[in-house]
């Protein structure tokens, strides 16, 4: 049982390279399962701590023999992860799509699957950011804020990322709009203050946002819970 082994390693009763052992476990499981069973069975291992941070593509290089029928596995793997929410699932889906289809494929996946994995938009933006693709980031941001529920906190993060891209492009109007949308989805004091960065922004959005925040605090003083992927999908009260 992987969970039992984790306890033994944690208590220093045995010394094992858990990552390598976990990869070998996936590698062997892949070999012994029928092709149509592999994706579902391998996915179950990721409920164990030792598997959380594994990259599925490393599984293919864990043993001496090349794994076969990989095309079906990747298709089944992506189809499965599209239906599963959570931090680990989102990461695995991102990595699988990037590995198979590149950034454009990741953007398409975000467009098709934003209700389950809205964070894929942000992941695609981060990939474009590595090569200073500010125009692509801005375009993704515009699309994302139209699609994603305005009450989801992940939408605020996406809007803020797009605002940074707009600042590099000197697109002032879009910068201000993204900052406003960021505030709408996560009405923190920090996001409010950002709307007062310039006189023009304060006049268009800042004063309106200040009134909205004051009204919200008065009506609901309880701070909403904020976490990462799982809580980014929680709609605020």
State what each model feature region is:
Residues 1-237:
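Eukaryote-biased, non-catalytic alpha-solenoid scaffold regions
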